[in-house]
From Swiss-Prot:
One GO term describing the cellular component: cytoplasm
Protein name stated in the entry: Urease accessory protein UreG
UniProt entry tagged with the keyword Chaperone: yes
SUPFAM superfamilies in alphabetical order: P-loop containing nucleoside triphosphate hydrolases
Chain segments annotated as transmembrane: none
Residues the entry annotates as binding GTP: 13-20
Biological processes per GO annotation: urea catabolic process
Native species: Haloquadratum walsbyi (strain DSM 16790 / HBSQ001)
InterPro entries per record: CobW/HypB/UreG_nucleotide-bd (IPR003495), P-loop_NTPase (IPR027417), UreG (IPR004400)
Listed HAMAP family: UreG
One function term, GO molecular function aspect: nickel cation binding
Localization per record: Cytoplasm
Alphabetic keyword roster: Chaperone, Cytoplasm, GTP-binding, Nickel insertion, Nucleotide-binding
High-level lineage: Archaea, Methanobacteriati, Methanobacteriota, Stenosarchaea group, Halobacteria
Cited function: Facilitates the functional incorporation of the urease nickel metallocenter. This process requires GTP hydrolysis, probably effectuated by UreG.
Amino acid sequence: MGYRDVAKVGLGGPVGSGKTALVQQLVPRLDDAGYDLGVIANDIMTQEDAQRLQSSFAGQIEKDLIAGVETGACPHTGIREDPSMNLDKIDEFSESHPELDVVLIESGGDNLAATFNPELADYFIFVISVAEGDDIPRKRGPGITQADLLVINKTDLAPHVDVSLEVLQEDAMEVRGDNPTAFTNCKTGEGIDDIMDIIERSVLFA
């Protein structure tokens, strides 16, 4: 079995938007639902995110199913222009764990232009946070407009940074059409069940 037999979900977004926190919320739910999964964390120069995830998921995911990929100075290179390092990791996962159902691939922090190579990700989630301002969807970067699912995280901060969730919702609908948008607080888990439902419908049961 190779990587083409495994559902691949890519998560991208700016630094600090909550990509790793979203992975930390999704993994226990996927595990509880009976899915065998792996996680790849891309970072510019370190394995810090991968190590954090290995610590978080001790006892839930085997350590060899959590891997780090160091992409160098351009985080989008490893997920778009040359995804070979990520694809090699997925192949390694599949060869050692033929029962694997899904791999979550977290990009290093990038800008609104970040997208995934379709060979690497079957489904693309782009994560932003309300702390970046309620004009972010209107900027229409490819990450915003092309993602299968837009996640707007840190909703609890909205009143503290003078951001309107209603404006974010309206603008997201305008620039994304029928593609879904989800609001989350990854610290508390609010909104994560909705994302799980979307992933199951769109990826795992597709």
